């Protein structure tokens, strides 16, 4: 029986799921806003928020722990240089999920995953 087992499988192997979430977290840290399905967004929050908490204390050991999870030097650099100092006073809840309707092909619920307090880039409206 599957009692007390947390986390979604997404019909993927363990390695595929881990690679998918490390890539999604790297994209989230790079772009500050990504669009994905709602279940993936909810699981992404469980992966990304502990990494941001880890980045509040910049040490070699913490950088190595983050790199072991992400396997992406650029994402680790962004995490410790931008995100850790940005959220130093916030006790958690660094990510916002915004539902944005359903995908046309399969009617899957979609959501935006957004970093809080992200810099807003003004786009020209014509």
Curated annotation (Swiss-Prot):
- UniProt key word Ribosomal protein: yes
PROSITE patterns this protein is in?
A: RIBOSOMAL_L17
Leader sequence residues: none
A single cellular component GO annotation? cytosolic large ribosomal subunit
**Its Gene Ontology biological processes?**
translation
Q: Which keywords are on file for this protein?
A: Ribonucleoprotein, Ribosomal protein
For this protein, the record's NCBIfam families field holds: L17
Q: How does it assemble?
A: Part of the 50S ribosomal subunit. Contacts protein L32.
Protein family (similarity comment):
Belongs to the bacterial ribosomal protein bL17 family.
| Designated name of the protein | Large ribosomal subunit protein bL17
Species in which this protein is naturally found: Xylella fastidiosa (strain M12)
């Amino acid at each position: 029986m599957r009692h007390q087992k947390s986390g979604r499988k997404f019909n993927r192997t363990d390695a595929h799921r881990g690679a998918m979430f490390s890539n999604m977290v790297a994209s989230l840290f790079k772009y500050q806003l990504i669009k994905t399905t709602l279940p993936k967004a909810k699981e992404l929050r469980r992966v990304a928020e502990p990494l941001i908490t880890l980045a509040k204390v910049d040490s070699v050991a913490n950088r190595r722990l983050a790199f072991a999870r992400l396997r992406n030097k650029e994402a680790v650099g962004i995490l410790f240089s931008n995100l850790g100092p940005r959220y130093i006073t916030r006790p958690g809840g660094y990510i916002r999920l915004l539902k944005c309707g359903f995908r046309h092909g399969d009617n899957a619920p979609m959501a935006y995953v957004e970093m809080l307090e992200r810099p807003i880039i003004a786009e020209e409206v014509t």
